[in-house]
Amino acid sequence: MQYTLKQISEHLNAKVINEPSGEVIITGLTYAEQAKENDLTLIDKQEHIKLWQNSKATAAIVSKKISKELAQVNDKPLIVVNNADLAMAKILELFSVPYPEQNGIHEKAIIDPTAKIGKNVSIGPSAYIGKNVEIGDNTIIYANVCIYNDAKVGTNCIIWPSVIIRDRTIIGHFCRLCSNCSIGSDGFGYRPSEDGRTIVRIPHIGNVVIGSFVDIGSNTCINNAKYGSTIIGDYTKIDNLVQIGHNVIIGKGCMICGQAGISGSVTIGDGVIIAGNAGIKDHTNIGSDARIGGKAGVMWDVPAGESHMGYPAYKDSELAKQWIAIRKLPETMKKLKAIAKSLNIDL
């Protein structure tokens, strides 16, 4: 797969600095330090300029704010854009490998006669489509996917192999579900029996509702609600190995990184970012545009727009003060002991 530099710049509607007179062929995309001839790279930060000096890349996509400085490093062509990261994302789409070809419904797929299958839907071998399931137009369902009774999947979705979608789940349009994720599994609801000798399982009769343009990573589990719905808002992106408990409500445009755990009945606003391995206590509220740091343990509500980190999690500015105080503790103790000694006080 290859494109000319002109084709790429036109695709981005961007101008080129140091534009060569002849045709320049681009055959790959990679990091500046790993690039070879005919590769296109990305330079979007001041500290990356040294990488460009030594890079073997043929050309680069660069942010406008550093383009003049980069142009003086050498005479290689630069595609100048406002946001180099987003521009590279568009070019990655050009070079991306097409999805595995799958046309129509495989003869070994199991589809209940009551299911409603839209136009141009592809269903792979050993997939199971249950009673009264609805699949929207142009959706691709790969091998071994199981979609149970009364579930609804919107249009233009991609469901990778071995995904499980349980009863009554509702999924919007243009969603991507990666292999082995489980949507609508039983919520973790148990109570001690009256005599305290056993544990009683609480039935969960709700469902999961996923908006449109949602991505869900491999091995992520989203539990169904005790009653009502576990809800994932439009445009939210969820990484691999994330646990989302029953009756959780997640807003629009959130990003949840790998190994995060969200306990039952947590409410998360719009635009929230939860970093890897963070844990959130049940029945807490995370306000819109909040940030939760990696490995944070959130034990209480987080106001909108605040950044919290640490265990237990505190506002980042407050936690920084605690960390500074702890680092100074040995020196402080040394001074305190000296004062105590001068006053004949034992510590």
Curated annotation (Swiss-Prot):
Q: What is its EC number?
A: 2.3.1.191
What is the reaction catalyzed? a UDP-3-O-[(3R)-3-hydroxyacyl]-alpha-D-glucosamine + a (3R)-hydroxyacyl-[ACP] = a UDP-2-N,3-O-bis[(3R)-3-hydroxyacyl]-alpha-D-glucosamine + holo-[ACP] + H(+)
- What is the protein named? UDP-3-O-acylglucosamine N-acyltransferase 1
Q: Which Gene3D superfamilies match?
A: Hexapeptide repeat proteins, MurE/MurF, N-terminal domain
Q: State its role.
A: Catalyzes the N-acylation of UDP-3-O-acylglucosamine using 3-hydroxyacyl-ACP as the acyl donor. Is involved in the biosynthesis of lipid A, a phosphorylated glycolipid that anchors the lipopolysaccharide to the outer membrane of the cell.
> What GO MF terms are annotated?
N-acyltransferase activity
Q: Which GO terms describe its cellular component?
A: membrane
**Could you tell me which InterPro entries the record lists for this protein?**
Hexapep, Hexapep_transf_CS, LpxD, Trimer_LpxA-like_sf, UDP_GlcNAc_AcTrfase_non-rep
* Organism of derivation: Francisella tularensis subsp. tularensis (strain SCHU S4 / Schu 4)
